[in-house]
Design a protein with these regions (language model features):
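Conserved double-stranded beta-helix
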Residues: 70-113
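Non-heme Fe(II)/2-oxoglutarate
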Residues: 1-81
């Protein structure tokens, strides 16, 4: 049986503010890169707007800042889970008004998520 838990205040407001500003700026950079045709529109190096779960919404896989946040949260998650964990990947999405993430089942590597 799976159990779920919430870890309140796992991330400080300063870190939340940084991550929010960082991802908003990264989204703007990608929009500029596409508009100016600096990068191939099929490249996902700077993120994507083509995530099937939430279309037309900025998302990024394996961003170094998000990987750093994940690494920092690892001890907190291990304490809550009461087991050693391996960080497999980071994924971030910037939701906008009207976006909906429908209930779904993540892949097995997401057994424990933060």
């Amino acid at each position: 049986m799976k159990t779920y838990g919430v870890i309140k205040n796992a991330v400080s407001l300063d870190v939340v503010d940084f991550a929010n500003a960082y991802l908003l700026l990264k989204r703007q950079v990608l929009q500029t890169f596409f508009k100016k045709r600096y990068i191939n529109p099929f490249s996902h190096d700077w993120g994507t707007f083509n995530d099937a779960q939430v279309p037309n919404t900025y998302a990024i896989y394996g961003d170094i800042a998000m990987d750093t946040l994940l690494k920092g949260l690892k001890p907190v998650m291990e304490k809550k889970a009461r087991e050693l964990l391996s960080c497999t990947y980071s994924y971030a999405r910037v939701y906008k008004k009207g976006d909906v993430l429908v209930r779904h089942k993540d892949r097995f590597s997401c057994e424990i998520s933060c």
